[in-house]
């Protein structure tokens, strides 16, 4: 990993955020804004193969016309990492819904202090090293940080 990426905020992106970003009717939605922040290298957006598969499956079922935008966003904005192995999940049992546990573990293993999702309740009680928040809340935090540069 290059030195510049070590100083960028690292954010793990869940499938619902990818879906919302790809399907966004506006350029100003929080999900798409987060992906654009990654595209212009202000943050490092990370996700896992499980997340990509889930988002793509949901888009195929509900909004197939958004698939080209989704694939472009994935290629330009995200670093996609391997899913945790099943044997790596045991120590994390009970920290998130069983279906979402691999996502929480992947976020922690990748050193992402933030996991962005609309399904915050699925990641409760969570892990102390990963703050789970909605896309709009992350955008507000970024805005506050930028305002502090004055």
Q: Where are the language model's segments positioned?
A:
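PIN-domain endoribonuclease scaffold, especially VapC-family toxins
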Residues: 36-91
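Short, flexible helix/strand-to-coil boundary loops that buttress conserved ligand/catalytic motifs
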Residues: 22-23, 59, 127
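A secondary-structure boundary/capping signal
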Residues: 13-15, 48, 119, 134
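A residue-level structural signature of the nucleotidyltransferase/glycosyltransferase Rossmann-like core
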Residues: 10, 44, 115, 130-131
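Alpha-helix capping/helix-boundary segments
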Residues: 17-18, 51, 103, 121-122
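Short, well-structured N-terminal submotif of metal-dependent ribonuclease cores
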Residues: 1-45
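Acidic, PIN/NYN-like endoribonuclease modules and their adjacent C-terminal/linker elements
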Residues: 101, 113-114, 120-150
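Active-site neighborhoods of divalent-metal-dependent phosphate/nucleic-acid chemistry enzymes
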Residues: 78-115, 120-121, 149
């Amino acid at each position: 990993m290059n030195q510049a990426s070590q100083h960028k905020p690292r954010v793990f992106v869940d499938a619902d955020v990818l879906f919302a970003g790809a399907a966004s009717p506006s350029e100003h939605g929080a999900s798409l804004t987060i992906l654009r922040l990654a595209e212009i290298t202000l943050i490092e957006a990370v996700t896992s193969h499980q997340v990509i598969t889930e988002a793509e499956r949901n888009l195929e079922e509900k909004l197939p016309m958004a698939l080209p935008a989704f694939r472009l966003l994935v290629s330009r904005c995200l670093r996609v990492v391997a899913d945790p192995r099943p044997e790596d999940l045991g120590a994390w049992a009970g920290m998130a819904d069983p279906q979402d546990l691999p996502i929480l573990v992947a976020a922690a293993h990748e050193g992402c202090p933030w996991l962005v999702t609309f399904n915050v309740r699925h990641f409760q009680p969570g892990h102390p090293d990963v703050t789970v928040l909605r896309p709009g809340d992350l955008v507000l935090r970024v805005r506050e940080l930028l305002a502090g540069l004055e």
